[in-house]
A protein has these predicted regions:
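ATP/NTP phosphate-donor binding region
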Residues: 1-14, 21, 29, 57-61, ...
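Glycine-rich beta-strand-to-loop/alpha-helix junction loops that act as flexible
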Residues: 14-16, 39, 150
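Catalytic core of DAGKc-family lipid kinases
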Residues: 28-33, 39-144
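Glycine-rich phosphate/pyrophosphate-binding beta-alpha loops
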Residues: 90, 94, 147-160, 225
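Short acidic/glycine-rich loop or secondary-structure boundary segments that cap or lie
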Residues: 94-97, 139-141, 153-157, 181-184
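Gly/Ser/Thr-rich active-site loops/lids in small-molecule metabolic enzymes
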Residues: 104-112, 154-156, 161-183
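A generic structural signal for short beta-strands and their flanking turns/coil linkers
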Residues: 125-127, 142-144, 167-172, 206-208
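ATP/nucleoside-binding phosphotransfer catalytic cores, i.e., glycine-rich phosphate-binding loops
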Residues: 133-135, 140, 165, 175-254
Length: 254
């Protein structure tokens, strides 16, 4: 990045979660505070930090008036390499929907996502996961999806890892047990309200590192495909400093 060649005191980054995660390794290595100007479709990091979502001037102003806030980032390691992410790593069903959406050439916009969702619902099959959290044993679990969150939401505000905050040094892991098509569809409205953790088919834990493996597993993070089959997801605590609104910070910390 040419901006880093000048040894700046800070960076202003314009983009969505996927754009930002794509340059995380360079930005973190620079060790300077970052001002995020949300310009993506989801902007879930900005939601988690209470940043202005639609007021560009207010977002840029934080470069001068904001409070530096160290936040965690996530790391996904697979057989093909290592990727960094800011929000949520999604594995199994919802990752397959994202994968299908990216492969479809028709229709466009939201209709393409809904068509992908319909196709994957028809093809829905629970997976036989193996999940290991931190130094615990590898636990077999049959299920539909697993989400590992540095923040509470992904996809523009869907609170799959409700309660997760990006500065506690841990990741929130949410696993949904084996569900049929009808039960999975019925779970979505509950998830959108952030009430799914109380359901018996939903399991929640916190960990610094979690390894998830399953035949045919696909993983996405910040909207980008990051691996398959076996994924080890870890937290890098306080790896990035973001300029935030001091008046709104306390409302976004657990």
């Amino acid at each position: 990045m040419l901006a880093l060649d000048a040894a700046p005191d800070g960076l202003v980054l314009v983009g969505g979660d996927g754009t930002l995660s794509g340059i995380l390794d360079v930005v973190c290595a620079a060790g300077v505070p970052v001002t995020v100007v949300p310009a993506g479709t989801g902007n879930d990091l900005a939601r988690a930090l209470g940043l202005p979502l639609t007021d560009v001037a207010a977002a840029v102003e934080l470069a001068l008036t904001g409070l530096p806030r160290p936040i965690d980032i996530g790391e996904v390691r697979t057989s093909t390499g290592t990727s960094l992410f800011l929000t949520v790593a999604a594995l199994a069903f919802d990752a397959r929907v994202s994968d299908r959406t990216n492969r479809l050439r028709w229709p466009s916009g939201a209709l393409r996502y809904y068509l992908a969702l319909l196709i994957e619902l028809v093809r829905l099959r629970p997976l036989d996961f193996t999940i290991r959290a931190d130094d615990g044993p590898a636990i077999p679990a049959r299920g539909t999806l697993v989400a590992v969150g540095n923040t509470a939401s992904y996809g523009g505000g869907m609170p799959v890892c409700v309660g997760a905050v990006p500065d506690d040094g841990t990741l929130d892991v949410v696993a949904v047990g084996p569900l049929g098509r009808v039960r999975l569809v019925r779970l979505f409205p509950v998830l959108l309200r952030g009430r799914h953790l109380a359901r018996p088919e939903v399991h929640h834990l916190r960990a610094r590192t979690v390894t998830v493996a399953a035949p045919g597993l696909v993983a996405y993070a910040d909207g980008e495909r990051v691996g398959e089959e076996t994924c080890t997801i870890s937290v890098r605590a306080a790896a990035l400093t973001v300029m935030t609104d001091a008046e709104r910070r306390d409302a976004h910390v657990r």
